[in-house]
Amino acid sequence: MRTELNNNATLLLKDGNVAHVNNIIGSGGQGFVYSVTVDGEEYALKWYKQNPGNVFYENLQKNAEDGAPSSSFLWPKAVTKVRYGSFGYIMPLKPEGYYEFSQYRLAKVRFSSFRAILNAAIDLCEAFRLLHAKGLSFQDLNDGGFFIHPDTGHLLICDCDNVFPHGESSGVLGKARYIAPEIVLGKNMPNSYSDRFSMTVILFMLFCIDHPFEGMNVVRYPCMTEEIERRLFGEQLCFMYDDADTRNRPVRGIHSNAITMWNLLPDVLKDSFKQEFAKAKLDAPETRMTEMQWIDVFTGIRDSLVKCPLCGDESFFRRTGVVCINRNCRGTSTAEMWMETESRSIPLFNNNILRMGKSDAVTGRVALKPGGNNILLVQNLTTHDWRVITPSNKSVTVAPRGFFPVKEGMKVEITDNKSTITYTITK
């Protein structure tokens, strides 16, 4: 069977189009990746070294026909007809400005802000929420499976060919160290629950760079064998910050990223990781946090992320106020008013920018009323009218670019094209 394709080769696609091979741009364990041209547009083509079989082929074809669950997936667009004993599929090319996650881990690329990391985490969770809502599971999420823009945090997921319906197997168990313990131990095949474990591992690595289970326990074994790997990542899996088991703590000089970043994380995020990686949760896949629960955590943290009024560095605002994390500044500030829902708290202070959705789009800004008296105003920076209900139950419409003065007890209804969220002004 022929494994590599020649430049200028032509391949027939199942949708009737023709792919013209330009040149090879990468390779991996399963196959080769080529630049191809289809109907004047450039795509990436993954060509399998070994034919994965009819079941895989038919599933890939169905996924291509159904379309991507979200624009965050570099999803199969069309499958080739079988040629040279194998086949492949075309997908969108990675846009300029996006980098593999491994480059962030090696510090070759850095996020421009903590907000960008939060945006990447939300993008990942939202993509998997939509994937699972379609009854599909990814089955092979690992650190080599996506690209991220360092400034916006926008995330793109590749290697989508192992996506199968929940409960059905693609024949691929996943990459070692990212596989859920029940898969390592042979208790289950990959499914949406194991996806959630792999996703949480990636989330931890987004924030702490290091792997959540590679502490002292792994350092003890400079030569990893299959037996040791099964024990450390299956039978005796232990989170490096487990409250009850300290044997796998990060090692100074080796896990410097984890030690530094863990201390900077808000308590709600640290508690979420501890909860998800606790032994009781590891043994009960169906109890793992859903993607929406993670999104609520991250949007809440993003609401509290503010710029220090003195130096401009990012810091987390709490009810007790904020202390700048810049050691050369240590400026302090407080908020007298907040916009709140049951799950979100947004501090209101002069010059704060309000972002109130998963998309991180700017919704409004806070300003001081000219003339003194320290009266705070909120400006509507959306394209929709807001409805403000005063403490005396009077309804006021705030048009785009308009302002309203902040008073305790007010309710603010903010509507976009899909939903309305009601905030209450509190002290």
Where do the model's predicted regions map?
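The N-lobe alphaC helix and its flanking beta3-alphaC-beta4 segment of protein kinase-like domains
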Residues: Y48-S72
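Conserved structural core of kinase catalytic domains
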Residues: L74-A120
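Catalytic-loop of the protein kinase fold
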Residues: F128, H132-P150
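Conserved catalytic-loop aspartate of Hanks-type protein kinases
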Residues: D195
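Conserved C-lobe activation region of Hanks-type protein kinase-like domains
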Residues: L203-K270
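C-terminal boundary/linker segments immediately following FHA domains
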Residues: I389-K427
